[in-house]
Amino acid sequence: MEIKEKTMEDQKVAIMNYKGALKDMDVLVSKLTGWIEVEEIETAGDLFAIFYNNPRTAKENEVVYDVGIPINPELDPDETEEIRIVTLIEHKVLSGIHNGSLDNIQESYNIMAEYSIENKYDIIGSPKEIYLKNKYEVDNEEDLVTEIQLPVIKMG
């Protein structure tokens, strides 16, 4: 797995906050993409999720996460009860690509965590998964491509 440091520029996103089961993400994605289509909002990137606790260890209905998608920064769409418009501010991340099923994505997280320690990075925020090729676009789970981003600062 190739891991590299990247600087993420400010990014305007449409985002939904959620606490519940990870399997509910499909419903959230449907609501978000439906809203984008109805409101004719120009997107500027791929669907993503930010996890505030570990979905693999949290109780089933207590996973805390956001689902979002970058939008054209010049747009100023109206928010809904569930969908907010926010700007993610510029920050540094360690980025790695996970290929294949999300069932074994924890292995990629472990590799990235080891890399961060070995290279003196401090992970300072919640991980973000960007679904470059998501399950709505591919027929086989092995064709999934997910970018993992860990917000970091370089130590020493």
Regions found by a protein language model. Give the residues of each.
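A solvent-exposed interaction/effector surface
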Residues: M1-G156
